[in-house]
A protein has these predicted regions:
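RNA pseudouridine synthases
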Residues: 1-253
């Protein structure tokens, strides 16, 4: 999409975030960097890096700021990514569109693709992962475990197996549901801990890889999102893609 809109020019993005694509409806796809919060935590320190350098309204799920001309601006989040996960994140200047797209996400009408680098300990097999996940609090921190809670569904494809000097594998994950920490837990419980996962991963492996390659990040990247919506009465198909980070590709060489 080549149209340039003034609304997109002065977004107070984090220094490493960038716009991947946008649409005249106000929809924008942002490449969220690793370690950056989608939005600030309610009790978070001011120093934490967030997607936008702006105030956040938790009730409305939007960032607000004043532009250079003195105008009040806002950007509504459509969905979220965990802080250690990088990749495609959708937001919009339209409150109405935000509500509509959030419903599309809840109704499983969007197609999302992630890539993860894992160590194979389980039996590698393409197919679908189906679980029930429980959210619990441990020492005041949110943790997710297999249990009897919300249904979690994802399609998995083993793209590259035991490659490079570290013998790691690249898997493509297509979540059908969007539960908290879903992909990280589903991979870990099946014997495929994601490299760099400090909660559900293989901590000894993480240390080994950090020493060998200096890669310490969670190797989970939201590669693409595809969705349909209507704009001015016309059906729109929107697709945004973020390439695999170079530092992750380095682990596969």
């Amino acid at each position: 999409m080549t149209e340039s809109l003034p609304d997109f020019e002065d977004l107070p993005l984090d220094r490493d975030a960038k716009i991947l694509d946008h649409h005249p409806s106000g929809l924008v796809a942002i490449d969220k960097p690793v370690g950056v919060l989608t939005h600030p935590n309610r009790k978070d320190e001011k120093k934490a890096r967030t997607l936008l350098r702006a105030d956040y309204d938790f009730q409305e799920e939007r960032y607000t700021w004043v532009d250079d001309a003195g105008g009040k601006r806002s950007l509504h989040l459509v969905h979220r990514l965990d802080s250690p996960t990088s990749g495609v994140l959708l937001a919009t200047f339209s409150a109405e569109l935000a509500v509509s797209l959030r419903k599309s996400f809840a109704a499983r009408e969007t197609h999302k693709t992630y890539y993860a680098i894992v160590r194979e300990k389980g039996k590698a097999r393409d197919g679908h992962w189906k679980d029930r996940l429980d959210e619990v609090r441990e020492d005041g921190k949110l943790r997710v475990k297999a249990g009897r809670g919300h249904e979690a569904l994802a399609k998995v494809t083993f793209e590259r197996r035991r490659v490079g000097r570290l013998g790691l594998s690249l898997i493509r994950l297509e979540p059908i549901t969007g539960r908290t920490h879903q992909l990280r837990v589903q991979a870990s419980t099946r014997g495929f801990p994601i490299v760099g996962d400090r909660i559900y991963g293989d901590f000894a492996l993480n240390r080994k890889i950090a020493r060998a390659s200096r890669v310490e990040r969670l190797c989970l990247h939201a590669t693409s999102i595809e969705l349909d919506f209507k704009y001015q009465g016309n059906p729109i198909k929107f697709y945004a893609e973020s390439p695999l980070p170079r530092i992750m590709g380095k682990l596969l060489s």
